Amino acid sequence: MQKPVPKKHLGQNFLKDRKIAEKIVENIDLKNKEIIEIGCGTGFLTNFLLERAKFVTCYEIDRNLIPILEKKFKNKNLRIINEDFLLAELEFKEKKTIIANLPYYITSKILFKIFANFEKFDKIILMVQNEVADRIVAKPKTPTYSKLSLASQYIADVKKLFVVGPDSFFPKPKVNSAVVLFDFRENLEAKKMEEFFWFTKKCFQFKRKTLYNNLIFFLNKQQIEKIYNFFQFAQNIRPQQLDLVTYIRLADFYFNNIF
């Protein structure tokens, strides 16, 4: 069988650690579940998914890996799609679970693609750069708290499960990875979500500035004063100091009273 060759421009670091693969699948109930795996790679994790899940659909962008995967998993409950997940039309109706070992350079884009299609998923387990995992689960008043923290925690209850060292991959990445679980919230509304994402992105446009100096780029002084008076904010408050609930209220206030 042809040996898979990692491609640097695709950010490929193939998982090779059996204990890590087992740990990932043990953190979620896969029985009778239909799974989407983004990036099969060598099919190492796919093997463990197929042992437990009802069906696995894999999006793999690297066409050189397709014949290897097809031969390895012949007659298995697996569908392999040679396509960039970012360009894929997600036409299924039944909710699915996503499991993926994501290239570091494209993590945020894939996350926001998933978020935009939140009604199609119930859970996500992602292997990401440890630094990104810290941003996803970050709390207010911490250095890693960001619009990604807010977006992730708006969509789901998020939990950093465990850290994975470079030795678990081929080739070895230069930094640690981490596995993060997203358990999607119920009763999410697409319009409210889009408004929240748009508003929080504006608030974190210039992270070192005060909230006021971020808002001034799209609001006038009277509108900002209306917000500050209603929420009783201190003049020097910064975007990192406000929690998720406050941002939800802020976005609602903006779209209902100012926009």
UniProtKB/Swiss-Prot annotation:
Binding residues annotated for S-adenosyl-L-methionine, in chain numbering: N13, L15, G39, E60, D84, N101
Any one annotated GO CC term: cytosol
Listed InterPro entries: KsgA/Erm, rRNA_Ade_diMease-like_C, rRNA_Ade_Mease_Trfase_CS, rRNA_Ade_methylase_Trfase_N, rRNA_adenine_dimethylase, SAM-dependent_MTases_sf
Coiled-coil stretches: none
Sample GO molecular function, one term: 16S rRNA (adenine(1518)-N(6)/adenine(1519)-N(6))-dimethyltransferase activity
Family, similarity comment: Belongs to the class I-like SAM-binding methyltransferase superfamily. rRNA adenine N(6)-methyltransferase family. RsmA subfamily.
Task of the protein: Specifically dimethylates two adjacent adenosines (A1518 and A1519) in the loop of a conserved hairpin near the 3'-end of 16S rRNA in the 30S particle. May play a critical role in biogenesis of 30S subunits.
Phylogenetic placement of the source organism: Bacteria, Bacillati, Mycoplasmatota, Mycoplasmoidales, Metamycoplasmataceae
UniProt cross-references to Pfam families, sorted A to Z: RrnaAD
Keywords: Cytoplasm, Methyltransferase, RNA-binding, rRNA processing, S-adenosyl-L-methionine, Transferase
Listed name of the protein: Ribosomal RNA small subunit methyltransferase A
Catalytic reaction annotation: adenosine(1518)/adenosine(1519) in 16S rRNA + 4 S-adenosyl-L-methionine = N(6)-dimethyladenosine(1518)/N(6)-dimethyladenosine(1519) in 16S rRNA + 4 S-adenosyl-L-homocysteine + 4 H(+)
Classification via NCBIfam families: ksgA
Cellular compartments annotated: Cytoplasm
EC number: 2.1.1.182
